[in-house]
């Protein structure tokens, strides 16, 4: 763009004497963060031992870098879309939705340890899910020009996870790092994806039928829909995933246990405790009306921030 489209210079951002799209600067920052995370992670291993959880300081730096690259790519697509002719806008709309689904997927990966199906009757799971997934789905679907954008974003996330769930176990693999508590002969796939598509569909229907001009009112309505619908669907669906009916190639509940997890009845039961990396028990909070009411407040605040963020995305032209 810099060399072949000099007429677009007026849309570029100047930084340290260079000119380029703002999205490129965001991607460069993400690249620097990812490169920094590698020696940081190596030092972390040498100091504290091997990884025992996904959420660690070097992994957060890496995740922020990946997020910046996704966000930069998405922003570049948006900027091109906002400047494109009407006949060219459709392809940019679909590229935008795909990039948004990758961001949703990244959040799901980061929250893996809080989203095990055995934890899906705990307050912690629903609190984090409504805060982060609600933010991503609302923020990027609001900025989209496509009808049923939230549904498309959630669908692309589910398709990606389902393909991983079904394809990974086709390849042979064996663990080489102890402790090994179970026989593993193939790659272990992640758990069945969360049913984020259900609240996404309801939100899209409400958005298409009602015009809500107030951001506060919209945040309240979307938060109530997302929190209640997600709670109801995932609560009972998790019970199915723990049952013997989900132990097949479609749902993969009998093939998603890693080698370091001992074999036992607790593999298919809800957990009352979580564990620290040092082996200490942490009691998990129950889902009560009072706790979910507070979670709803968090969700309203998160979705309100998502609406503000989507407003900025709509104006991106650089």
What are these regions (language model features)?
Residues 1-4, 31-46:
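Metallocofactor- and cofactor-centric catalytic cores in central/energy metabolism, strongly enriched
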Residues 1-2, 60-77, 128-145, 191-207, ...:
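Hydrophobic cores of alpha-helical transmembrane segments in multi-pass inner/ER membrane proteins
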Residues 2-22, 47, 72-94, 139-153, ...:
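Juxtamembrane membrane-water interface segments of multi-pass membrane proteins
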Residues 10-26, 39-98, 112-122:
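Membrane-interface helix-loop-helix junctions at boundaries between adjacent transmembrane segments
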Residues 33-39, 102-113, 156-169, 225-235:
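Aromatic-anchored segments of alpha-helical transmembrane domains
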Residues 40-60, 109-130, 165-186, 242-256, ...:
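Membrane-interface interhelical loops and short amphipathic "cap" helices
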Residues 134-202:
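Long, well-ordered mid-to-C-terminal structural blocks that present hydrophobic/aromatic surfaces
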Residues 180-193, 212-235, 245-307, 311:
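C-terminal transmembrane helix-loop-helix hairpin of multi-pass membrane proteins
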